[in-house]
Curated annotation (Swiss-Prot):
It comes from Methylotuvimicrobium alcaliphilum (strain DSM 19304 / NCIMB 14124 / VKM B-2133 / 20Z). Changing residue 414 to A: Loss of catalytic activity. Reduces the C14=C15 double bond of 4,4-dimethyl-cholesta-8,14,24-trienol to produce 4,4-dimethyl-cholesta-8,24-dienol. Complements the deletion of the Delta(14)-sterol reductase gene ERG24 in yeast. This is Delta(14)-sterol reductase. It is found in: Cell inner membrane. GO terms for biological process: ergosterol biosynthetic process; sterol biosynthetic process. The gene is erg.
């Protein structure tokens, strides 16, 4: 490992310690699963009302909605998970190399997300039209599925914990078993060519999210004889986001999760439970709420989504292209940048000259456009934007600390040149 690489690894470790979870990891592991149940129960049985009561009997009634696992849900999920794993391993797609590991080696990854995504949609569509699968099954089985996937992830994380105990030198567990169970012990656990972290990060959770949305739309149609404009907006926006994700799938290889985070309960549960079951809250809510939107409202929400997308994708692609070719023209002029002592270039024009994370800003605009179609009858569809804002604020701080540790003076110079973190003139 070069001197530079060991400095980078030391910076990652330092930042991880500062922006890690402290002791809150235990609280998260205990509190988050009930929170997902809570939101689902509020949306499904209480018309989206946030239930708070001091009446113990009312709470007992509330929690009695937690659904036990069923063989039906377990069978569905097993078929789903194994089917997606088979696609990850065997579906056609280019093989690309991941980022350098701490020992200097690189892993191969099969980038077949878009094929798997479209193939899955075609198969599900075929099964539904032939009458072998009910279009509303994911809505009807949502409660049992939530329990099944929760149980699965807790067990799977146990498997991952033991898997990593004999891992590489840089993967040594901390010796605090519950913490290691939460954070994971292996960076890239693999069964044959199946990279479990990359697979769970994208496939069984993200494609499931889209299918759940479609199932919600089908249920709305079954119950009310219509699929409303707000439902079409939510399903359309989120489908577009997912297609875009799979088209640019390779970008996931440079994310913090793939580069630095071990694969334990946190990522596993986040990918398989949190993502599909909370990112569908808007569609879940709309199943029982068939309000319309004024035309100006629809235009404003679509405009917000498209503007957010243009910023989010524009900023990410601009950085990607610039890092490959610093002589590129950015917004009609030669790119301006700071050359760091480490040799990395920091773009200071285009989106990266307006704020240091315009890509987060664009992502937040998109997230808000997913919530607004639900109108203002319940706070639950807005849960996503609240959570996502907290997530990205935390990420920005962590990334800033990481870049400061890596680039020192050069980063301070960039911060001076581009003072806004995420939102120009505001934050
Ligand atoms: N939907 C979700 O759940 C979710 C969650 C998280 C993130 N995201 C999205 O994923 C996308 C990527 O996010 P990310 O967290 O990986 O952050 P990012 O902004 O894509 O990457 C930050 C890294 O880029 C480099 N960099 C920073 N400033 C630069 C500049 N001016 N010029 C060139 N390089 C610069 C630095 O790394 P090096 O110098 O070391 O290369 C820095 O660590 C974002 O659009 C974000 O909104 C989505």
């Amino acid at each position: 490992m070069s001197e530079q690489e060991s400095r980078d690894n030391a910076a990652v470790d330092a930042v991880r310690q500062k922006y890690g979870f402290g002791f809150s990891w235990l609280v998260l592991m205990i509190a988050l699963p009930p929170l997902v149940y809570y939101l689902w129960i509020c949306v499904t049985y209480y018309q989206g009302e946030l239930v708070f009561t001091s009446d113990a009997a009312a709470w007992r009634r509330f929690w009695s909605h937690v659904a036990p696992p069923t063989w039906h849900a377990a069978g569905l999920y097993a078929a789903w998970f194994l089917g997606q794993a088979a696609l990850q391993v065997w579906a056609p797609g280019p093989t690309v190399q991941g980022m350098k590991l701490p020992d200097g080696s690189r892993l191969d990854y099969r980038m077949n997300g878009i094929f798997s995504f479209l193939f899955t949609l075609a198969v599900v569509f075929g099964l539904v039209t032939m009458g072998w699968l009910d279009a509303t099954v994911l809505y009807d089985q949502l409660g049992p599925l939530l329990t099944v996937v929760n149980i699965f992830t807790f067990v799977f994380a146990g498997f991952l914990y033991f898997w990593g105990l004999n891992g590489k030198q840089w993967e040594r567990p901390t010796g605090r078993p519950f913490y290691d169970y939460f954070m994971g012990t292996a960076l890239n656990p693999r069964i044959g060519s199946l990279d479990l972290k990359l697979f769970c990060e994208a496939r069984p959770g993200m494609i499931f999210w889209l299918l759940m949305n479609l199932s919600m739309a089908a249920k709305q149609y079954e119950l009310h004889g219509t699929v409303t404009v707000p439902m079409l907006l939510v399903v359309g926006f989120q489908s577009f986001y997912l297609i875009d994700y799979f088209i640019h799938e390779e970008a996931v290889l440079t994310t913090w999760d793939i580069k630095h985070e071990k694969f334990g309960w946190m990522l596993c549960w986040g990918d398989l439970v949190w993502l599909p079951f909370t990112y569908t809250l808007q569609a879940q809510y709309l199943v029982h709420h068939t309000h319309d939107l004024p035309v100006w409202g629809i235009i404003a929400i679509v405009a917000l989504n498209l503007a957010g997308y243009a910023i989010f994708r524009g900023a990410n692609i601009q950085k990607h292209h610039f890092r490959r070719d610093p002589n590129r023209i950015v917004w009609g002029k030669p790119a301006k940048y700071i050359k760091t002592k480490q040799g990395s270039l920091l773009l200071t024009s285009g989106w990266w000259g307006i704020a240091r994370h315009m890509n987060y800003f664009g992502d937040l605009m998109i997230a808000l456009s997913w919530c607004l179609p639900a109108a203002f009858g319940s706070p639950i569809p807005y849960f996503h934007i609240v959570y996502f804002t907290i997530l990205l604020l935390h990420r920005e701080k962590r990334d800033d600390a990481m870049c400061l540790a890596k680039y020192g003076e050069d980063w301070l110079q960039y911060r001076k040149k581009v003072p806004w973190r995420i939102v120009p003139k505001i934050y």
